Amino acid sequence: MTRIQTVLGSITPNLLGRTLTHEHVALDFEHFYKPPPADFENELQQKISMATLGYVRLYPYSSRENVRFYDEEALEASRKDVLLYKKHGGGAIVENSSYGLKRNLEFIVDLAKTTGVHFIAGTGHYIHATQDATHTNLTVEQMTDLYTRDILTGIDVKGRTVKCGFIGEVASVYPVQEFERHALLAAGEIQEVLGCGVSLHPHRVSKAPFEIMRLYLEAGGHANKCVMSHLDRTIFDMDELLEFAKLGCYLQYDLFGTECSYYQLNSTVDMISDGQRIENLIKLINEGLVDRLLMSHDIHTKHRLTSYGGHGYHHIHMNILPRMFQRGVTLEQVEQMTVTNPANWLSFNA
């Protein structure tokens, strides 16, 4: 019988509930800091406040405070929003912080114990540039051993053994670097053996998802247990997205709540709005792909938490799903995307 491995132990899939499949509750995103425009340097160097929030929303990666998503203030703000998520019907959060993002398993375990939300932690490697010297020279075999150990044996967290429940997020740039290729191959090899879920993070060009899926599949990974993240900032052309969908993985729109068209990490494109995300999901539903769709926010900076003027982890449930119902999406289809699909993806013989 398949089960889902949470940080507090394995559960049956029917207990998971409504699930956010790509979030962070604590991580270090300082690698992506970008110097602010000279005209706004003073505002972006200050603490986040009502006076500076407008600048931070437009240039989120130019505020050092904003990308320090790991200090005590951030943890308390994150805890507050997880409680709001639980209050408004949330059941589970898939925490995608992998090696290179300084995941905080102690905090994740504490959140799971104190909020009642199921947390599923990931193993895997983020992009090469975020890794420290203990990881940069790992071979495919060494990565395979590490990921397998994290899932089957577990990690000691203050005397508690915590097992990871999926591989992810496994991230890469474009073209894929050798270290990142190793991580993708390791993910595919382990997935074939264990049957666990995998979450991939593509670079910000439309060719990237195709390339990393090819590597993952060639290593033996199963498409129906793999999530392609961040498609709402990667593949904008619907025909190209439908072509990608033929590969058989889950298609994830995970930047809900990001309503600024200026995308600082790739200023050559315009970030789509929540309205466009809804429109695209409806198109994919009409193409018969509802059983392959996932939704989330990918919160990874402070300004997206309610304590800093943001939308929090409950945004999809409180603001997006009602709009989807208004546009003809059925309760059955919403349950498929937010409950059934996450459970199917995360279930394996744990």
Curated annotation (Swiss-Prot):
- What are the recorded GO MF terms, alphabetically? hydrolase activity, acting on ester bonds; zinc ion binding
Annotated a divalent metal cation 1 binding lies at H22, H24, E169, D298
Write down a Pfam family by its short name. Answer: PTE
- Disulphide-bonded residues: none
Is Metal-binding given among the entry's keywords? yes
Query: What Gene3D superfamilies does its record include?
Result: Metal-dependent hydrolases (3.20.20.140)
Record flagged with keyword Hydrolase: yes
Q: What is its EC number?
A: 3.1.-.-
User: Which GO terms fall under biological process for this protein?
Assistant: catabolic process
Cofactor(s) recorded in Swiss-Prot or TrEMBL: a divalent metal cation
Free-text remark on how the cofactor is bound: Binds 2 divalent metal cations per subunit.
Sorted UniProt keywords: Hydrolase, Metal-binding
What does the sequence similarity comment in the record state about its family?
Belongs to the metallo-dependent hydrolases superfamily. Phosphotriesterase family.
Which protein is depicted? Answer: Phosphotriesterase-related protein
Q: Which organism is it from?
A: Drosophila virilis
